Amino acid sequence: MKKIILLACLLLTPLYLKADHHTIAGPGEGAFNTIMVQANDTAKYVDYLRANPELFKAVGAMAAGVCITRSGNDYEGQMLVWSTYPDLASAMHANTLYDPNDAPSALANLRTVKYGVSWKGLKSFRLDPGWERVLRVKVSPENLNAYVEALRELETAIINSGHESFNMGVFGPFGGGVHETQTLMVRAISPTARESGQIADEYFAGASWGPIWEKSRALIDKVVSDTYELCEQIYSAE
């Protein structure tokens, strides 16, 4: 817990990684980078990345993929490219190996780069992309430990209610600029949109875990954004 408090005070925050079902443990173990982009054609952009794995190999990524915003978009073609690393040092170093604004023309013509961020996880997290509700929230440092613990409790309760593939992560930015600074990113992940909707239906029907969700919400100072993303892994170093 002391590590989490220190991270919060430094405006840092955490990932436990699992590429093809590998798991990376809590604070300090594992990190990832994201590049937020506007794609002219999301399918063509993803196809290009999938066909050019050397882009991810060159920066030492353990795994990589994409998330396409399907609801709550700020702009058309909103998506991100993510890549995972064994530690934050490797993630930071990767930023020196590739400049997204100096990409080959074949790639540059497919998208406009918005910004990049490095992330750390505050709780264990299984990298198993799917249909993901993504909340960006602001939480006071004095409430951070309680908030993370509430999410752990909520994740366990939803899994035990019959959603065995459900997964939650809470992450904080390094180098978030005006876009992400002092903001936590929470991901609630289900295999499909239907199952995600079923979980929401169960909440409104009085699910036993409802009070835990409400407890976590009470610890949030502000919800910055609320989107749904369709995510997939397109590269693995193994």
Task: Identify the residue ranges that each predicted region occupies.
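C-terminal segment of classical bacterial N-terminal signal peptides
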Residues: 13-19
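Sec-dependent N-terminal signal peptides
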Residues: 4-13
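Short S/T/G/P-rich N-terminal loop/turn motif that feeds into the first structured element of a domain
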Residues: 19-238
